[in-house]
């Protein structure tokens, strides 16, 4: 029975998540404020910033050097083309459009940034205005407050 209890405990810790965007990496900085902190995670040559509560930082044991996964829902990802400036979002990653799945109202745009594939759900109208196409350079844009951390 003891082995069964260990397996049950392990299974309760393994979770699946529907969010499409997962950036696995190492925490390189934790900047704590009064209520929230900004956690910076290095994945490939990029760094993603996540604003999370101090309570979450403590509960997850987030410290510099810890391996974590930063997560963002596809609906929280914006897409830009050309030079991105004058925007408050902290996370901007240049990549290449590798696939567009067009729907009647929304499009799912897949953008490859180094070895990480990002999915963004944007309006079909926006995809058309941006003239997105496979092979075109585009930027993934994510607010730090839209990034979750899994540890």
Predicted regions: what is each one?
Residues 1-24, 29, 47-49, 54-99, ...:
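Glycine/charge-rich catalytic "coupling/switch" loops of P-loop NTPases
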Residues 34-40, 104-110:
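Short aromatic-glycine-enriched beta-strand elements
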Residues 7, 31-33, 112:
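Intrinsic disorder/low-complexity detector
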Residues 42-44, 112-114:
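Short strand-coil-strand connectors
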């Amino acid at each position: 029975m003891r082995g069964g209890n260990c397996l049950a405990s392990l299974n309760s810790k393994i979770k699946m998540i529907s969010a499409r965007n997962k950036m696995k990496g190492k925490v390189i900085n934790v900047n704590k404020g009064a209520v929230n902190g900004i956690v910076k995670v290095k994945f490939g040559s990029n760094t993603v910033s996540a604003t999370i509560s101090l309570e979450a930082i403590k509960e997850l044991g987030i410290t510099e050097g810890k391996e974590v996964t930063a997560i963002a829902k596809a609906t929280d990802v914006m897409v830009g083309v050309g030079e991105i400036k004058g925007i408050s979002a902290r996370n901007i990653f240049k990549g290449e459009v590798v696939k567009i799945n067009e729907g009647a109202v929304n499009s799912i745009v897949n953008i490859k940034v180094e070895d990480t594939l990002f999915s963004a759900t944007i309006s079909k109208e926006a995809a058309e205005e941006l003239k997105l196409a496979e092979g075109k350079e585009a930027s993934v844009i994510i607010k730090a407050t839209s990034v979750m951390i899994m540890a």
